[in-house]
């Protein structure tokens, strides 16, 4: 049985004061509500250490939003997985649609980062998803397949480590556009991803990998989305910046 994961991607938001206040509210809410899921917050790099000071030992895990391929060296502006581990991170988001579209990250670069995350002892949250143009051209499954197949060959050979992979499906066309992906569309994409994982890695791995929904999950749609057979949690953006909304999404797992 896959344990749900509710992950908050704080993106480019939060001074130290604001981030620690949000982390405190999330930590205290999780302690009070005891949601039936794993909980993760992914702040911006500059506040990782401060947020870790708030959530350490609380059951709320810490993650980063990106990482470098290299471990060290002359790579100005980059942050390595070893550095992320050093401040308490256990997860890292890779291949987010904003990294792909705004910063030109390719499938090959994302694959290199996935390999580096495993090397450095971090659990990768691999983001995949199609644009509006690709969906309207009925290329959704083709895009998902290309993005996944670029990364699966770099996974460790050990099935137990393969099972640790987290995949996040981001229908890019449904993020901040006013368009909404139906639960049926979400489930269809998640089922396709799991089927591809089964084909490439085997059923045991596919059945264990958690697939998160990253298409503007909010308190008012979380319960229905989280009720789908292949939706194992959410990668939450805007709603993660308000503790009450973030905690309310977790209620969708038990309500």
From Swiss-Prot:
Q: Name one GO molecular function term.
A: triose-phosphate isomerase activity
One term under GO cellular component: cytosol
The compartments listed are: Cytoplasm
- The yes or no answer to whether the keyword Plastid is present is no
One Gene Ontology term from the biological process aspect of the record: glyceraldehyde-3-phosphate biosynthetic process
Pathway(s) this gene product operates in, as recorded in its UniProt entry: Carbohydrate biosynthesis; gluconeogenesis; Carbohydrate degradation; glycolysis; D-glyceraldehyde 3-phosphate from glycerone phosphate: step 1/1
Catalytic positions?
Answer: 96 (electrophile), 170 (proton acceptor)
Q: What is its main location?
A: cytoplasm
By its UniProt entry, which PROSITE patterns does this protein fall under?
TIM_1 (PS00171), TIM_2 (PS51440)
What the entry lists under CDD domains is as follows: TIM
- Determine if Cytoplasm is one of this entry's keywords: yes
Question: Where on this chain does substrate bind?
Answer: 9-11, 176, 216, 237-238
Q: What class of enzyme is it?
A: isomerase
Tell me what reaction this enzyme catalyses: D-glyceraldehyde 3-phosphate = dihydroxyacetone phosphate
Supply the EC number(s): 5.3.1.1
Q: Which PANTHER family match?
A: TRIOSEPHOSPHATE ISOMERASE
Q: What does this protein do?
A: Involved in the gluconeogenesis. Catalyzes stereospecifically the conversion of dihydroxyacetone phosphate (DHAP) to D-glyceraldehyde-3-phosphate (G3P).
Similarity comment = Belongs to the triosephosphate isomerase family.
Protein name, entry field:
Triosephosphate isomerase
């Amino acid at each position: 049985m896959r344990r749900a994961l509710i992950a908050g991607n704080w993106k480019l938001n939060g001074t130290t004061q604001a981030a620690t206040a949000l982390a405190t509210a999330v930590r205290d809410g999780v302690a009070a509500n005891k949601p039936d899921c794993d909980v993760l917050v992914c702040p911006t790099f500059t506040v990782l250490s401060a947020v870790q000071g708030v959530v350490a030992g609380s059951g709320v895990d810490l993650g980063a939003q990106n990482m470098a391929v290299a471990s060290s060296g002359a790579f100005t502006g980059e942050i390595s997985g070893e550095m992320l581990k050093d401040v308490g991170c256990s997860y890292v988001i890779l291949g987010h649609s904003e990294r792909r579209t705004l910063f030109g990250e390719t499938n090959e670069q994302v694959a290199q980062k996935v390999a580096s995350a495993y090397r450095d002892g971090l659990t990768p949250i691999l983001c995949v998803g199609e644009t509006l143009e690709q969906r309207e051209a009925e290329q959704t499954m083709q895009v998902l397949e290309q993005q996944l197949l670029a990364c699966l060959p770099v996974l460790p050979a050990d099935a137990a480590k393969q099972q640790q992979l987290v995949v996040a499906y981001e229908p890019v066309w449904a993020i901040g556009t006013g368009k909404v992906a139906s639960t049926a569309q979400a489930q269809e994409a998640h089922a396709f991803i799991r089927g591809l994982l089964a084909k490439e890695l085997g059923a045991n791995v596919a059945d264990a990998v958690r697939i998160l929904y990253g298409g503007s999950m909010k308190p008012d749609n979380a319960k229905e989305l989280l009720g789908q057979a292949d939706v194992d949690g959410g990668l939450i953006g805007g709603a993660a910046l308000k503790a009450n909304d973030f905690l309310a999404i977790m209620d969708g797992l038990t309500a």
